[in-house]
Amino acid sequence: MSTTTNIQLNNLTAISPIDGRYWGQVQVLSEYFSEYALIKYRVQVEIEYFIELSKLSELKPLNAVNKEDDHKKLRDIYLQFKESDAQKIKQIEKTTNHDIKAVEYFIKEKMHTELQYSEVVTEFIHFGLTSQDINNTAIPLSIVESVEKVLIPQLKQSILEPLRQFAQQWKSIPMLARTHGQPATPTTVGKELMVFIERLENQINHLEQSVPHTCKFGGATGNLNAHKVSYPAIDWVVFSEKFVKVLHPSLKRMRFTTQIEHYDNVASLLDAFKRINTILIDLCRDIWTYISMEYFNQKLVKGEVGSSTMPHKVNPIDFENAEGNMGVANALYEHLSAKLPISRLQRDLTDSTVLRSIGVPFSHSILSFKSIQRGLSKLVLNEANIAKDLDANWAVVSEAIQTILRREGFPKPYEALKELTRVSGSKKITESDIQTFIDSLSIPDDIKSELKLITPFNYIGIIPDF
C-alpha cells in the first residue's frame, strides 16, 4: 500500500467535512474553537491574570508595571495575536511537550524583548497556577462568547425570524391536522409554526438565563495552596472570583473543585443545544412531510439538479441536510455531556482529549441552522391543496357536533357520530353526509342551525395572539 506524504491540508484534503466541504459556512466558529483560538484564549487568560496580580500592593515586584500604559501593551499581546504567534507557541511546544508551558514561555519572551520587563517581573506569569486554571477558564470563555456572539444570534436570524414571519403570514389559514398520520381536528398553519417557535424560545431563554458559565481557578488541586503559602495575607478566593468576572461578566468561579472544573454546567449547556437540535429535527421532519403532502411547494433554483437520473426531481435537501448534521451534533453533545463530568480522583486527562472536539458539534449545529434557513426561504404555501384536503375530510367536525350534543343532553352522541364517521376503505364523509345526519337528529332547529355552521374551515378552536 502506497503512503502519500506530500498532501497539504486544504478544503479538499481535510478529513473532517467541517474543515473541508462545509468550511465556508462554519469558519466563523474558528475564532472560538480552533487550535489558534484556544491558544489565543489561553494567552488572554494569562495576561489578564498577570494584570490583576499587578494591582495587588502586596506583590512588590509588580508595582512598577501597574500602569495603564503597561496594561495596554500587555493586552496588545493577545489583542494583536497573529497566526504566526500561535505557530511560535507550537514550535516552543515541540521542546516543552507541554502546551500551557509553551504559552507561558511565549509571553515571558514577549515581555523581555518587547516590554523590557525583568525576569523578576515575568516570573509572575502563571504564578501559582496549574494548566487547568488556564484551560478551564479559557474554554468556558470561548464557549460563552461563541454562544452570545454566534450561536444564539444565528439561531434567531436563520430560523426564528423566518418562522415568525411565516406564522404571522399564515396565522389564519386553516389546515387539517394529523395525529397518528390520520385526519384530526383542524388547526391553522401559523399556529403549528408557533409550536416550534415557542419551544425554541423556551430553550433559548433557558440558555441565556438559567445555564451558568462556570470555570475553575484554584491551583493544582483546587485549594489555592501555592497562592496561600506565598502570600497568606491576600484573600485569594475573593481575588479569583473577581478575576474571572474581568474576563467576562457571565463567568462564575466554582469554589470547590479538584484540579479541573467539574463540567456539570458545560454538560447542561450541551444538553440544551441537543434539545434545540431535537426540536429542529422535529421541525425538519414535519416540513419534509408537508412538502411530500404538497402543503408546501419549493421554489425552483436555476441550475440545481434534484437527481442524477430523474430530471423532474425537486427534493427537500436543505431539511434533510440539516437533519443529518443535527444527528451528528447530538451524538457529540451526548458524548461530551456524559463524559466531561467524570474524572478519576482529582483529575485524569480524558477531559482534555474530548474538549478539543467541543467546536465540532457547534459547527454541525451552525451548518444545520443555515441549511434550515435555505429550506425555509424556498417554501411556498399551497393553499389550494390545503383547502382541498380539508374539504375531503368533513368527518373531523364530528368532534364538534358530538360535544354540542353532549351539552344539549342528547343521548349517546359520541356513539352516534362514531357510527356515522368511522368508515373504512375509500369511503369519505362529505358535507352532504354531515348535513343529512344533522337533519335526522331530534333536536331544536336552532341547534341544528348551529351545527350546520361548523365546517372543517372554521372549526379551528382558540388560536392565541402572536
Curated annotation (Swiss-Prot):
Gene Ontology molecular function, alphabetical: (S)-2-(5-amino-1-(5-phospho-D-ribosyl)imidazole-4-carboxamido) succinate lyase (fumarate-forming) activity; N6-(1,2-dicarboxyethyl)AMP AMP-lyase (fumarate-forming) activity
InterPro entries: Fumarase/histidase_N, Fumarate_lyase_CS, Fumarate_lyase_fam, Fumarate_lyase_N, L-Aspartase-like, Pur_lyase, PurB_bact, PurB_C
Keywords, comma-separated and alphabetical: Lyase, Purine biosynthesis
Annotated catalysed reactions: N(6)-(1,2-dicarboxyethyl)-AMP = fumarate + AMP; (2S)-2-[5-amino-1-(5-phospho-beta-D-ribosyl)imidazole-4-carboxamido]succinate = 5-amino-1-(5-phospho-beta-D-ribosyl)imidazole-4-carboxamide + fumarate
Pathways per UniProt: Purine metabolism; AMP biosynthesis via de novo pathway; AMP from IMP: step 2/2; Purine metabolism; IMP biosynthesis via de novo pathway; 5-amino-1-(5-phospho-D-ribosyl)imidazole-4-carboxamide from 5-amino-1-(5-phospho-D-ribosyl)imidazole-4-carboxylate: step 2/2
BP-aspect Gene Ontology terms: 'de novo' AMP biosynthetic process; 'de novo' IMP biosynthetic process; purine nucleotide biosynthetic process
Taxonomic superkingdom: Eukaryota
Lyase as UniProt keyword: yes
List of residues binding substrate: R21, Y22, N97, H98, D99, T130, S131, Q259, R347, S352, R356
Signal peptide: none
UniProt xrefs under Gene3D superfamilies: Fumarase/aspartase (C-terminal domain), Fumarase/aspartase (Central domain), Fumarase/aspartase (N-terminal domain)
Pfam families: ASL_C (PF08328), Lyase_1 (PF00206)
Assigned EC number: 4.3.2.2
UniProt-annotated catalytic positions: H180 (proton donor/acceptor), S307 (proton donor/acceptor)
NCBIfam families: PRK09285.1 (NF006764), purB (TIGR00928)
Family note: Belongs to the lyase 1 family. Adenylosuccinate lyase subfamily.
Subunit field text: Homotetramer. Residues from neighboring subunits contribute catalytic and substrate-binding residues to each active site.
Name of protein: Adenylosuccinate lyase
Organism of this sequence: Dictyostelium discoideum (Social amoeba)
